[in-house]
Every structure is written in C-alpha cells, then in structure tokens.
C-alpha cells in the first residue's frame, strides 16, 4: 500500500474510534444524569410517606396504661437486669449514685437514679455519703446499662424522687431544697406542671421508687415529719402532671416512709418502711378516689432491717428491733404475700424472696418458697417494686417485678465515696433459680489509695 494511503487509513480508523468513544462518554453522562434525576424525584416523593409513617407511629405509641388487671400468678423470679455500674466505673465514666429504681412505660423500661454530681474514681466523689445536697439530680438511662454521662437523660434536680409513665408521657416527682422547706417539682413530658410545698417543714420526702398509674391518673405517697416518731403522710393523685386531689392519712402510731407502690385490679397497694418502731412493713391501699385502708403485714417472716429472728408476727407495728429500717417491698396475693428482704437481720447484706401463703393476714412464720438473690456475704441495700403493664408484655395481667440496690463504699468499706449498682427480677410462672448476683467490684479504687 502507498505509504501516504496507509497513513490516511490509520488516521481515519483512529478518528472513527475517537468519535465512537466520545459518543459512548456522552451517552454515559446522559445516563447518569437521568438516573440521578429519577432517584432525586423518588426521594422527594418518599419523604411525605416517611413522615406520615412517623406521625402514625407517634399516634399509636400513646396509650392509657389501664392498671385494671390483676397481678400475674407467679411461682418465682427470673433475672431481668444487672448494670455492673461499680465494676465498669473503676475504668469508665460512671455516675456516683444512690436510690436507683426502675419504671416501665408501654415501650421500654428505664433505670432512674439520684446522682451526686460526680463520677466514680474522681475527686468529686469524696463525701458522697450525704443524702441531701444541692448537687443531687434525678437522671435515667436504659435498664441494665451502667449510668454514665453518655447514655443518661437529665430529669430534674432532686434528693428524693419518684417517676412513672401513664401511657402518654413520663411523670417525674423531684424534691429538692432545705430540710425545713423543700419543694417537690412535678414534670410531665419534661415540662414543669406543678409543685408541692413541704407542709410540716421537716424533710419532705417521697418513694425512691416508681409511682403507680391507673386509667391515666398517677399516684404517689409523701412523708413530712420526724423519721423516728409520728409524721404526716399524704397520698397525691395526679393527672398529666398536675395534682388533682390529695388526702392525709389518719394513721396514729403508724410510720410510712419510702413506699413501694403498684397497681392491682384498678387500685393501688403500697408497702413502706417504718423507721420509727416496726420491724414489719406498714401498707396502705387505696382506690382512684383515694379511699384508703391501712395496716401492717402480719407475717412472722419479718421484712425490715434491722429485725428480730422470725417468730410470731403482728398486724400492728412489731416493736422488737423496730427502730431504723431500709426501703423494701412486698406483693400481696389474697391472704398470701411475697416478701423481699435482706438475708442479714442487722446489716444491709444478702437478699432473698419468700412466699408466705398466709402472711398478709396470718402471724405465723411458715413459708413455702425461698429464692436466693444475693448471698449474705455480699452487700445489698434498698429494694423496691415496679410492674410491667399488659401494654408492654402482651400478657393479660400485670407482671410484678423488683429491683435491689447493691451499695458499695462508705460507711462499710474503705473508700471516700458511696455508690451502688442494681439488679432486677420479674415474676414468672415457669422455672427459676436461686443464686447470688452481687455487685462484684474490687475495692478500693485508685482515688481511695
């Protein structure tokens, strides 16, 4: 072939290849642009659907926790949670707390707790054995998680508190201020809705466990007056965070502190602490109109600490070893009662659950079930009740549950701080096991040395 023709032929082929390549690139660009336009259009069209779904879910999420069901029949207690807060706090950022308690909505269970405005293993943890200070706040986190700045929600300023969910929003009751004039601040959905002023000017205090909600109304019990003598006790009925009714108990020779309350068949039962002169626990039950009955658990299986050895009980205050006490709970089933108590009779150590089939009304000390929760060689502390409503569990009854505070540090151990972790159990009508679920932290910490 002529050299010039060869050059022309090769040039023509290269030009054709270049034109084809250019057309392919233009086609690719057009394809990408069309595809992007379609995706953008679909995205904009999907947004109203997404928002509609979100709003629908929010609407469905609001219910009324009726509280009209009876407590579920149970044969024992299944482990529900353990937060290991002190163990984790030796290395991680965990709050110094006390008075933890659990409450459940129809969607979730949360651990509420009173912080000391300090973290474990930090200088501000020094001296945190004090109950009432302006630094204490009520916070909450998902149940079973160690309470830290990263997973906790601020609720209110408080050194005594309660909280519960009515099916629409959380209600918090938070007491703070001076001993001679404290005020309880009520918040509903995080907004201040009402206040309650100390009426005896002597350390207004409340449950340190969940309030009880029935048919959209929530109920709590408060105490004002001496911790070692006759005080004043009131039941409050609240709706959407506002007090709509209250009644003062006519209860001479009774002492009610730190009540553990739960709904049962449309009414509320509270089992409390007698810090004056009872080693058995006082109770108050009331309907939605605040018509009430009062008494003491009659069983010879005594529930407070300190307490005498089990023996013959009393349907009034059992005065032997009756002074002082610890927050606790029981669940009434007809004439029978599940009693939660420390294993030790004179220190806050160990924990057990006992079923006394005649203990609500009978004074003998016979029981048929004992389930170990914490060994007597390990520290316990406060304990209290909470429930899971049918709207959460899908059951046709209210599930009884309880939590146990596992106190560590001062005054029993060589630390500069006092704090605790917690465990919880729920009642089931199936197989359970007794064991020991202690706090398990190795003390002292670095800050203590």
UniProtKB/Swiss-Prot annotation:
Cross-referenced CDD domains: Influenza_NA (cd15483)
Intravirion face residues: 1-6
Metal-binding among keywords: yes
Segments for region (Hypervariable stalk region): 36-70
Positions of region (Involved in apical transport and lipid raft association): 11-33
Key words, A-Z: Calcium, Disulfide bond, Glycoprotein, Glycosidase, Host cell membrane, Host membrane, Hydrolase, Membrane, Metal-binding, Signal-anchor, Transmembrane, Transmembrane helix, Virion
Alphabetical list of InterPro entries matching this protein: Glyco_hydro_34 (IPR001860), Sialidase_Influenza_A/B (IPR033654), Sialidase_sf (IPR036278)
Enzyme Commission number(s) from the entry: 3.2.1.18
Main subcellular location of this protein, as a coarse class: virion
Protein known as: Neuraminidase
Organism this protein belongs to: Influenza A virus (strain A/Chicken/Hong Kong/37.4/2002 H5N1 genotype X2)
């Amino acid at each position: 072939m002529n050299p010039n023709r060869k050059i022309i032929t090769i040039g023509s082929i290269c030009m054709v290849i270049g034109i084809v390549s250019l057309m392919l690139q233009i086609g690719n660009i057009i394809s990408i642009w069309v595809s992007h336009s379609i995706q953008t259009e679909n995205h904009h069209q999907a947004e109203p659907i997404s928002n509609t779904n979100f709003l629908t879910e929010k609407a469905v999420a609001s219910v009324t926790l009726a509280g009209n069901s009876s407590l579920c029949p149970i044969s024992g207690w299944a482990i529900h949670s353990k937060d290991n807060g002190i163990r984790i706090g030796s290395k991680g950022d965990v709050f110094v707390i006390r008075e933890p308690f659990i409450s459940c909505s129809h969607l979730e269970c949360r651990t509420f707790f009173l912080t000391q405005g300090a973290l474990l293993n930090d200088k501000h943890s020094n001296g945190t054995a004090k109950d009432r200070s302006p630094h204490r706040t009520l916070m909450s986190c998902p149940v079973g998680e160690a309470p830290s700045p990263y997973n906790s929600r601020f609720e209110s300023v408080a050194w005594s508190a309660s909280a519960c969910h009515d099916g629409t929003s959380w209600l918090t009751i938070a007491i703070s201020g001076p001993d001679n004039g404290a005020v309880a601040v009520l918040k509903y959905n995080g907004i201040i809705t009402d206040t309650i002023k100390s009426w005896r000017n002597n350390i207004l205090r409340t449950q340190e466990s969940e309030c009880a909600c029935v048919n959209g109304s929530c109920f709590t019990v408060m105490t004002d007056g001496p911790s070692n003598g006759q005080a004043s006790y009131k039941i409050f009925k609240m709706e959407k965070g506002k007090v709509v009714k209250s009644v003062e108990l006519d209860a001479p020779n009774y002492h009610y502190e730190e009540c553990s309350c739960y709904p049962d068949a449309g009414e509320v039962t509270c089992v409390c602490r007698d810090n004056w002169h009872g080693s058995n626990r006082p109770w108050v039950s009331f309907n939605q109109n605040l018509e009430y009955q009062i008494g003491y658990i009659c069983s010879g299986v005594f529930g407070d600490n300190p307490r005498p050895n089990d023996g013959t009980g009393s349907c009034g205050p059992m005065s032997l070893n009756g002074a002082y006490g610890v927050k606790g709970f029981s669940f009434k089933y007809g004439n029978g009662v599940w009693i939660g108590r420390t294993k030790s009779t004179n220190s806050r150590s160990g924990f057990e659950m006992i079923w006394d089939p005649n203990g609500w009304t009978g004074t003998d000390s016979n029981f048929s079930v004992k389930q170990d929760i914490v060994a007597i060689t390990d520290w316990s502390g406060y304990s209290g009740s909470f429930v899971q409503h049918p709207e959460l569990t899908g059951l046709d009854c209210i599930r009884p549950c309880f939590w146990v505070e596992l106190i560590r540090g001062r005054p029993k151990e060589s630390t500069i701080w006092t704090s605790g972790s917690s465990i919880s159990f729920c009642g089931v009508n199936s197989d359970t096991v007794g064991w020991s679920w202690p706090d398990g932290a190795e003390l002292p910490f670095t800050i203590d040395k």
